[in-house]
Amino acid sequence: MINISFYNKRYNNDNIIDTMSRSFGVTKNELNLVNNITLVISLIINKEKVGAICIISNNDLYDYMIRLGKNIEELNGIYLFRATKGAYIYNMAVDKRYRGHGIAQKLLDISLYVSKIKKFEYCYSHCENQISHHIFKKKGFNNEKHFKNSLNKEISLMSYWLK
């Protein structure tokens, strides 16, 4: 049985973030959740969390950067499109035991579906490795730009138009 759980961190406490951190062996800082306005989608199979992905609206991310007084174009290597009707998809994680079984594709499908429901015009993401690049490319995302982030790591900016 597959259950899909949605958590809007704006309305929930840190428990879901703690659970996500433990499930995927990362710290809260590595999850890089943005100011309690992230939608976290978890995929649960037989009561076990096997994957998760995060979405934030471009407007919310942009507003957050302004409040921090950060450069509009870059925040820790995250580049934004200037259009307002977009969703940023990030922090996709799949439990190592379930990799290679289409979990990442399913999480991405759900993210695109939620983005359509929310009336976003496009989604975008940053791919930091060949596996994530392949997953997004397979789903129909286009390469927009390649660059190095503030940590000198190669990044691909990829986009997907929903309309």
Where are these regions (language model features)?
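Short amphipathic alpha-helix that is part of the acyltransferase structural core
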Residues: 1-30, 35-59
